[in-house]
Amino acid sequence: MEQNTDNVFNFSAGPAALPKPVMQQAQQELLNWQGLGTSVMEISHRSKEFIAVAEQSEQDLRDLLNIPDNYKVLFCQGGARAQFAAVPLNLLGDATTATYIDAGYWAESAVEEAKKYCQPDVFVAKAEKEGKQAVLPASEWQIHPDAAYVHFCPNETIDGIEINDLPVTDKPIVADMSSTILSREIDVSKYGVIYAGAQKNIGPSGIAIAIVRDDLLGLAKEVLPSILNYKVLAEQDSMFNTPPTFAWYLSGLVFKWLKAQGGVKAIEQVNREKAAILYNYIDESDFYINNVHPDNRSLMNVPFQMVKPELDAKFLKEAEALGLKSLKGHRVVGGMRASIYNAMPIEGVKALVDFMRQFEQENA
């Protein structure tokens, strides 16, 4: 028996839920896009019709993030993991080290990849505050004087940790914003490179965004594959080879949807409201636990455990039956995790809290 999609809320950490209006538009246009009699995924990436999609997508993203003119916007392949390699290979130049701020799993993953190309200087920013997980303030981060750049991940999806400040440094700041881009306002001009896998707040998996300051182009090592070379991608308008056109088109629809919601400033207010509803209930409960200090709690990913972990399987089964999908926590930390990206409506978070309350009453 098929489930009524009106009552389904997808809390997947990624690939994550897409806005329903975007999915509906893609469905309507799937077989006959713009009256061409074909799908958008069947036309040449060099056709005037698709180039218009690409150009509009870039402009909409520039508008949403207020990206300065001296930054290139690149639509890349390989996801954020490809950027783990692309960043050092593009930015090191003659340097032999870069500072990596370690606040969690994804920052550590970037370090492991960087070790193939340099000797990363790792500053562990993990901390404990009032018995909870936290991150040291950026003012306390130690940056190597010879670092080519400073890399960090502002939002760690597994632990549900978010970093809200930046160091004061003359080094280019590189941020893996895969799980936080477009969720809150940022000042792009403070960064050298911002990159993000698409499958959280941008679109479907298969594409990534890199926003690169112009002065950082042209530093690439000779061994860098052309497909990862920021300068090559910029010169070729992100079409050095055939791009993932359908993912690009869908990302463009997401950008238009976000503009229609009032842009990043408006969606940030919604995101803060959603997160507050969930965190407030967890904090008021004696049955559920979140182990992150309020100063560093993620707006996008809310992990929680129960005081009776033996009930995890029952919780997940009953939640699934009610249309509350993909709440299982990452295998590294266990428990549950609610990912509440831009596409998650407030109604979904309220439905989750209602279920959590009922489950607590029945099982406490």
Curated annotation (Swiss-Prot):
EC code: 2.6.1.52
Primary site of residence = cytoplasm
What terms describe the molecular function in GO for this protein?
O-phospho-L-serine:2-oxoglutarate aminotransferase activity; pyridoxal phosphate binding
Gene Ontology process terms (BP): L-serine biosynthetic process; pyridoxine biosynthetic process
Q: How does it assemble?
A: Homodimer.
The record ties this protein, via InterPro entries, to: Aminotrans_V_dom, Aminotrans_V_PyrdxlP_BS, Pser_aminoTfrase, PyrdxlP-dep_Trfase, PyrdxlP-dep_Trfase_major, PyrdxlP-dep_Trfase_small
Q: Which reaction does it catalyse?
A: O-phospho-L-serine + 2-oxoglutarate = 3-phosphooxypyruvate + L-glutamate; 4-(phosphooxy)-L-threonine + 2-oxoglutarate = (R)-3-hydroxy-2-oxo-4-phosphooxybutanoate + L-glutamate
Record-listed pyridoxal 5'-phosphate binding positions: 80-81, 106, 157, 176, 199, 241-242
On cofactor binding, the record's note says: Binds 1 pyridoxal phosphate per subunit.
Which coenzymes or cofactors are required?
Answer: pyridoxal 5'-phosphate
Any one GO CC term of the record: cytoplasm
Describe the function of this protein. Catalyzes the reversible conversion of 3-phosphohydroxypyruvate to phosphoserine and of 3-hydroxy-2-oxo-4-phosphonooxybutanoate to phosphohydroxythreonine.
Tell me where in or outside the cell this protein is found: Cytoplasm
Alphabetically sorted, this entry's keywords are: Amino-acid biosynthesis, Aminotransferase, Cytoplasm, Pyridoxal phosphate, Pyridoxine biosynthesis, Serine biosynthesis, Transferase
Query: What is the designated name of this protein?
Result: Phosphoserine aminotransferase
The pathway where this protein functions is: Amino-acid biosynthesis; L-serine biosynthesis; L-serine from 3-phospho-D-glycerate: step 2/3; Cofactor biosynthesis; pyridoxine 5'-phosphate biosynthesis; pyridoxine 5'-phosphate from D-erythrose 4-phosphate: step 3/5
